[in-house]
């Protein structure tokens, strides 16, 4: 007697055995042998999930009581799941006729015909398509609301993990209001797929004469907003793809918007398939390109919806559909990954940046907080950055050494655990080998200034073990260096070297730190870096916006200091607590973050510069700044904020950059900064947006304040609130 379950029947036994054999043997998937090709196909069968949507064409007698058999047959055709009407097909495909006696059939989809775990894993419950809560007929709208609630309740009863609801209108405020209340107030966490029509012209309320600036994306974005912008983990969108692709699914800048949305699935209509060379079902190239472009992860789902009854008399067509769909996308996600295997020198190999995708990180504040060994260790993995620093030091030594001098005094300001110190001493050797052969060597006299007492332990060890006691180590805040140097009789520097930059350039207070040593410098002292500039670019990312807004503070972390001006204090119970008078959500949204951006798109082709600082600052120029940066929007979108970058001129033409167009190849020391808005701002094609940003300074710290002004094409202006006033949420202490 067989011990196989329904789940096992989704794939033939031999496939599972082949997969187990491959996994146990540990064989490489790179072989091009026929057996490996078969294995890759079977791996795609389990890795890429293709579902079948039950339609009127599937209706058979007592189908609602034979769901297990229906699913098992689909499994034989390589379908991993089914999208099935939650009330059953009899109820789902009922046709209202306007009669008062005409009532929809009751929900009649018995739960005991499948194990609970199979309902959860293999069935997506679809809301009956006749339900229209936004109908112009008040009675039918009310009836629809009543039965939508019944079907939502039954989804919870069955314990389904996912449900689908198909929008048939451009505007569905009443449907959104019902869903909004349900998802926000019920303790039920199923995922909602909001299925869009294949084209805006398919909407019941479409009117070519009155509809302007509306497309499929705006239908989704408005519905998402009307549902309270619920978490994209549980509230997602499904695109319907038919034979005719609308312009917004062929024009790249419009297609890209879906990369910034919680895209869950593609509903593929069978009518788009064509006959291939051998007569098998094939997908047109335009549709393949669309799927590949949006296939950012194998967690996406594809659903086949039959629009013709071909599958009833062509028994192989179902398999051909699923095979063609898997073939279209099976290698996309793998090909897009960088090769970081054996022999690769890609920096991402050892930093594992993939783990940081879309993870929010607070910018470091090394001036007010001492870094730990693990942070230093992470920095030190990026050899490319240190190599470029070495190149800059060699360039400066070449210029200074041209007069034949024997000694150059270098101060490393902020030594950390010493990697730049090591690079400076190697640069001395490189300079002498290149430019002083047959002459007296140039000697670097190196001082390292570091305020972190813990890192001083490492620096002293390095001085004995690696640097042969050549370095003078000064344990001090660099801003105290002029006084210390005067007391101890230290020489003035010919070169100062520092690495004090954050993801937005000056946001780790490099200007304030370096200004503190200006009085100790010679008029000819070279600073490495000489100049740095921050840049911004508007971005769209529903995921990042929701992630920032949803942050919460665990009870045991409630006294951890905020990133703002406020400090922890004792409450009435003598317990330490960090208070947020501005509110937790506003506190979250009024900060700058560091993020390895993935689920986002830029809304401008190029960045624009913001703040520039040059060193040494002999003119004692103020470090306060104010700027207005304007961008013209080229599509309808939701602006969530700005990505921030910087570049720095280390010495003359030697540069480091994370600005996208000039990014230093292979360097991963800095991820982009994100400057969020409190709420996503809807922008239209042709709108002008201006980021107004100030860098403010007082006696104890530095902060940014920012807001956006939007000018629409009709001249109407909108301004967002000023964020982070007086540094209440994000304050960089000096």
From Swiss-Prot:
Residues 1-16 have a biased composition (Polar residues). Its main location: nucleus. One of its GO terms (molecular function) is protein-arginine omega-N monomethyltransferase activity. It comes from the Eukaryota. Residues 541-589 are annotated as: Dimerization. The record marks 379 as: Critical for specifying symmetric addition of methyl groups. Catalyzes the symmetrical dimethylation of arginine residues in targets such as small nuclear ribonucleoproteins, histone H2A/H4 and cbp-1. Dimethylation occurs in a distributive manner where the protein is released after the addition of the first methyl group prior to rebinding for the addition of the second methyl group. Plays a role in the negative regulation of DNA damage-induced apoptosis. By methylating cbp-1, may prevent apoptosis by repressing the capacity of cbp-1 to enhance cep-1 dependent transcription activation of the programmed cell death activator egl-1. This is Protein arginine N-methyltransferase 5.
